[in-house]
A protein has these predicted regions:
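Zn2+-dependent metallopeptidase catalytic core
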Residues: 48-89, 153, 271, 277-282
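Disordered inhibitory propeptide/activation segment of secreted metzincin zinc metalloprotease zymogens
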Residues: 1-59, 69, 106
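Active-site scaffold of zinc-dependent metalloenzymes
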Residues: 38-42, 113-143, 201, 311, ...
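Catalytic Zn2+-binding segment of zinc metalloproteases
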Residues: 77-79, 156-173
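Acidic, glycine-rich calcium-binding repeat modules characteristic of RTX/beta-roll
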Residues: 55, 137-152, 170-188, 194, ...
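GD-rich hexapeptide-repeat beta-solenoids
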Residues: 34-36, 40, 44-45, 187-190, ...
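Catalytic zinc-binding patch centered on the HExxH motif and its immediate surroundings
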Residues: 99-125, 188, 195
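Extracellular repeat-rich scaffold modules on cell surfaces
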Residues: 292, 296-364, 368-369
């Protein structure tokens, strides 16, 4: 396979996608979708202590796995594929992975060069000294979902064509709405508060988000484990969608404690009858089955589903074909939601949903499309049905004299 050169990317016209794309991508195609990668081992015994102009400290199994998982995460949602060219290789390689110390990384957590930037395009460097001492003892967790763990996916995304929401990029791409070159890049979440976890991991607004979804310190949990819904849309604009991801009957279980590795995931699921499950929760849960809108609104990057007090859960990516943002592709749909043992809030979508509240004083919203089943349980449940022509919902488990049925309008 020949080296994939960088090609220019047209703007999508969507403020979030254009706010994350740097202007170029690798020149892959449906017939030739892959780029090659190599891990650079320890360079101490090489001439000048460098490989390709940079030193490297080698890779632990955990570090290597974080980048392998990051590549798989991109392949799961997009048409881009990755081929292992073997370690310390410079033949037909687009992505070069290095680990550096604080001095060589110039104090940053890591850095990467986007396609089309310069001769170092595709280089990804991780600053190991941010999370490990010089005698190889851990300083901070790099588990997925941790403050430092997201660095690996973040830098890889740069190397395939994504930028920060607060930057203008190689081709003067727009920033996210509400951001300027004078914005505080660590605190300003912009208009609609989308420049933050859990909506994009390309942001610098992580522990500074103060949005209730993530911790306010560099914790070992609570941040994105995967691509955010906005990242997914941007990658799909660059490389197309993966129409075959998670096509079976999948259950997405809400995390129920703030332990190491708890975090946020954006769901891209293209088939089967699927469910977000909070059935083991003792605390109230919110489960919202609606997709990220990608519109200029607070739900552009998704509607978070989580257990109360837990920094982690799910959003659901925008349902589209990677070309036309205005049409639902009928692919990324989660049909069912199950609550727990407290007062839960379950919200359906345009599909035929089964919303099961179980115990507690639950509030269930249905009737947005399809043939919904709203199932209560012991408690003072509320059942709200969309008051539009064609709405349909079956209500079960209404406790006489306790529960109530109402109608709501979404537009």
């Amino acid at each position: 396979m020949a080296y994939q050169t960088a090609v220019a990317v047209p703007r999508s016209g969507n403020v979030w996608i254009d706010g994350l794309t740097d202007g170029y991508r690798w020149g892959t195609s449906a017939e030739n979708p892959a780029i090659g990668y190599t891990f650079i081992g320890h360079t101490r015994d090489l001439p000048g202590g460098e490989f390709g102009g940079y030193p490297s400290l080698g890779w632990s199994e955990q570090e290597r796995q974080l980048l392998l998982d990051a590549m798989q995460g991109i392949a799961d949602v997009s048409g881009l594929r990755f081929i292992d060219r073997g370690d310390n290789n410079d033949d037909n390689v687009e992505l070069w992975f290095y680990t550096l110390d604080r001095r060589d990384a110039d104090g940053s957590y890591g850095f990467a060069y986007t396609p089309g930037s310069d001769s170092d395009e595709g280089l990804v460097a991780i600053n190991r000294s941010m999370y490990q001492t010089s005698d190889f003892k851990p300083k901070h967790s790099i588990a997925p979902g941790s403050f430092y763990g997201i660095t690996f996916l973040h830098e890889l995304c740069h190397a395939v064509g994504l930028k920060h929401p607060h930057d203008s990029g190689l081709k003067q791409q727009p920033r996210f709405p509400g951001l300027t070159k004078r914005s505080n890049q660590y605190r300003d979440s912009g208009m609609f508060n989308q420049n933050a976890h859990p909506f994009t991991q390309l942001t610098y607004v992580d522990k500074g988000a103060r949005n209730g979804y993530v911790p306010t310190f560099a914790a070992d949990h609570g941040f994105l484990q995967t691509l955010g819904a906005l990242d997914i849309a941007a990658l799909q604009w660059l490389y197309g969608i993966n129409p075959n991801a998670s096509s079976g009957r999948d259950v997405y279980r809400l995390p129920l404690s703030n332990t190491e590795g708890t975090g946020w995931r954006a769901i891209w699921d293209t088939g089967g009858i699927d469910r977000i499950d909070g059935s083991l929760a003792e605390m109230p849960v919110t489960i919202d089955l609606r997709n990220a809108t990608l519109g200029q609104d607070d739900a552009a990057g998704g509607y978070p589903s989580s257990a109360e007090g837990v920094f982690g859960g799910f959003t659901i990516a925008h349902d589209w074909n990677g070309v036309d943002l205005t049409e639902s592709a009928g692919l990324c749909i989660i049909e069912h939601a199950t609550g727990g043992r407290a007062g839960d809030r379950l919200i359906g979508n345009q599909a035929s949903n089964r919303l099961r509240g179980r115990r507690g004083d639950d509030v269930l919203y249905g009737g947005l499309g399809g043939k919904d089943r709203l199932i209560g349980g012991p408690g003072r449940d509320q059942f709200w049905v969309e008051a539009e022509s064609g709405s349909f919902a079956i209500v079960r488990g209404l406790q006489p004299g306790l529960g109530q049925v109402g109608f709501w309008v979404t537009r």
